[in-house]
Amino acid sequence: MMKKYSLTTHSTETCQILFTSVSNVFKYIPSGTRRILIMYQDSVSQVLPIFSAASGVQCYRYLIPDSESAKQLGVAEQCWRFLAQNNFTRSDLIVSCGGGAASDLSGFVASSYLRGIKVIHIPTTLVGMVDAAIGGKTGINLKEGKNLVGSFYSPYIVLCDPSMLTTLNEEHLKSGLAEIIKCGFIQDESILSILEHNAQDHMDCSQRVCAETLPPKLLEELIHKAVSVKITMVDSDFRDTHKRQFLNYGHTLAHALEAATSHKLPHGQAVSIGMVYAAQVAFAKGLIGRNILTRHERILETYGLPICPPEVQWRNITPYMQRDKKNMQSNDTDSDKDSREMPQISTQSKLVLLREIANPFISSVSHTVLLKAYEAMFPQ
């Protein structure tokens, strides 16, 4: 049975998030569409035969790189040129098939080509289903940091088919679980309780739970809970000025670690480490007790996610943390200053922290506390 969510992205626009078979995609193609560009990753090429059944629509395929390699300006330019060379118009359509990087890139390409053509996302990873494809954020990376160039652009439809997750490997499932667990910490504590209860039944001799052993019905329940959390936060703050930023819990350090390691650290692992770090910061500031910090470590480690950063020196991380989007707001109120003067490097960074579970807020934290919390994450 199909399940549907509605997400209001602008005052006059609503994005439908549909849980149904991917084979139903042609039911939702906008009328008048003559051309479709399918931007896909090699790992999901098995989806392509579905589009060969299109009637009256010309389908083009465009293979994009896997993972963060797709999110480059050069790749976006190649896509724009392909669209132009094949005479795509505003009445045509892009369909993305793949993980979070596929929806990030295709959304950015769609938002900028001809100043906007429709895009449908078909997320095929757990991260894509619960996070990246939902909410209208698009982005590509620069050497200076992750997702520094992008737009807010609502997809026409997001089509989620949980049956596609059955072929995901353990690492991809764990990455998605990190985003689901994040939703438990910032809003819906029942997510944490479900995972903790499941761990009691499926823990192996190493005190770990293999993500691949999650019962399909349980995984689908967790997906719907995480999607509901994201919709609640995006619906009231599409342009990411306040409440939506809570979805960045754990992401300040995560994005910095990804950039500092040249994206060798998978996103979900980085988010896991970032959440433990945010809990360490909150604990250092006296906002939460050790019990909440320990709960972070226990649930993430139980599901095979890392809780300790790789060996990356603090001085290599701080430049990326300072470029975090939450810090990109001018505090300069002196009108006599030369507008060309370079701003001073802040001695603080903004992080999403918890006062308690499901009670997030944004806090400015001194670099002294940030360093102390980072050092506390390494075994003594």
Curated annotation (Swiss-Prot):
Which reaction is catalysed here? 7-phospho-2-dehydro-3-deoxy-D-arabino-heptonate = 3-dehydroquinate + phosphate
- Keyword set for this entry? Amino-acid biosynthesis, Aromatic amino acid biosynthesis, Cobalt, Cytoplasm, Lyase, Metal-binding, NAD, Nucleotide-binding, Zinc
Query: Which Gene3D superfamilies does the record associate with it?
Result: 3.40.50.1970, Dehydroquinate synthase-like - alpha domain
Report residues binding Zn(2+).
E179, H251, H267
Q: Which domain of life is it from?
A: Bacteria
- What GO MF terms are annotated? 3-dehydroquinate synthase activity; metal ion binding; nucleotide binding
What pathway is this protein said to act in by its record?
A: Metabolic intermediate biosynthesis; chorismate biosynthesis; chorismate from D-erythrose 4-phosphate and phosphoenolpyruvate: step 2/7
Which InterPro entries does this entry report, sorted A to Z? Dehydroquinate_synthase, DHQ_synth_AroB, DHQ_synth_fam, DHQS/DOIS_N, DHQS_C
The protein's Enzyme Commission number: 4.2.3.4
- EC class of the enzyme, as a word: lyase
Required cofactor(s): NAD(+); Co(2+); Zn(2+)
Q: Which SUPFAM superfamilies does this chain map to?
A: Dehydroquinate synthase-like (SSF56796)
Query: Which function does this protein serve?
Result: Catalyzes the conversion of 3-deoxy-D-arabino-heptulosonate 7-phosphate (DAHP) to dehydroquinate (DHQ).
Family, per the entry? Belongs to the sugar phosphate cyclases superfamily. Dehydroquinate synthase family.
Q: What is this protein called?
A: 3-dehydroquinate synthase
- Tell me the classification of the organism that encodes this protein: Bacteria, Bacillati, Actinomycetota, Actinomycetes, Micrococcales
